[in-house]
Amino acid sequence: MRMKDQFGNITLHNADCMDILRDMADNSFDLAIVDPPYFDGPNKLGYYGASKSSKGVKRPFYEVKHWTIPENDYFVELMRVSKAQIIWGCNYFRFPFGAGRIVWDKVNGRSSFSDCEIAYCSLIDTVRLFAFMWNGMCQGKSVAEGRIQQGNKALNERRI
């Protein structure tokens, strides 16, 4: 089922992206920023863990109806319809992306999460690194801030 909503000059599509991309003209928009699925874990039974936490709290059940890892035709279509692209997780796909890379250092220390995320960026021919803390609830605009208390008005005023 295809649904479309218009908000000013922004159009939101709720449909299979391949159907939408095939219908679009070449260079339809200036920049595509995407983070496609890169592994099939959510399709596997029990991927999201046990039905109860170690404390006995019941976890919500999220049914995964469709989780498809894109093939090369997705990237071909995406590059056809967009003038520039930023594609997160480019290191997981067998596609001949150009040289430009963005490396996000998540400043997450010793955790089970990846230390970095890598994106292809067609706007550059080099590698750019930026650090932005992301480790579950520890998020920040500055590495020096450490854990951010979301309701901390004084800290938010200092940022402005």
Task: Describe each region flagged by the PLM.
Residues 23-34, 38-60, 65, 79-160:
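Class I S-adenosyl-L-methionine
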Residues 70-77, 81:
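Short, conserved SAM-binding segment of the class I
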Residues 13-14, 67-71:
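A conditional alpha-helix N-cap/helix-loop micro-motif detector
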Residues 1-33:
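SAM-dependent nucleic-acid methyltransferase catalytic core
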